[in-house]
């Protein structure tokens, strides 16, 4: 987040995935990535239906969790291809309506603009200075706020020099 609010730099995403649950990872859609997490066979059947591939839920290679893990090299590219057909917002709506756990995968810019980030007051505007990432802790539901910006070059020179013995 620091890089984004300081100069607009958005870090690269890295692939994700569970070695014991398939699918349980991020995928690209027509526009932005999504994380799918149908963590059991019932949720997988719902996910397959939303993807328009009901037959995956009964296919002997994919019907049960252990089989999906064993055949993930075949299954994951098919899921990836299906998800490219629609934008993220549409998939999120369809998956959520069906009860399939899923979430948007935000880049740093999207994250910095979320309601949750604003509500957490994690990004703080310093008086007369830049926006910074605040402390990631709170006390009694209050996040400590930085009282001021760093001093400008030479701001305290006279004060410091005046305090030195002559």
Can you say where each PLM-predicted feature lies in the sequence?
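Short, glycine-/Ser/Thr-/acidic-enriched flexible segments
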Residues: 41-42, 110, 144
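Substrate-binding/catalytic subdomain of NAD(P)-dependent oxidoreductase enzymes
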Residues: 1-15
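Short solvent-exposed loop/turn micro-motifs enriched in small/polar/acidic residues
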Residues: 17-20
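Conserved PLP cofactor-binding pocket of PLP-dependent enzymes
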Residues: 96-117
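Flexible, small-/acidic-enriched active-site or ligand-binding loops
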Residues: 63, 126-166
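Short low-complexity, flexible loop/linker segments enriched in glycine and/or proline
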Residues: 117-123
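Aromatic-enriched alpha-helical interface/lid elements that frame and gate functional surfaces
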Residues: 22-98, 102
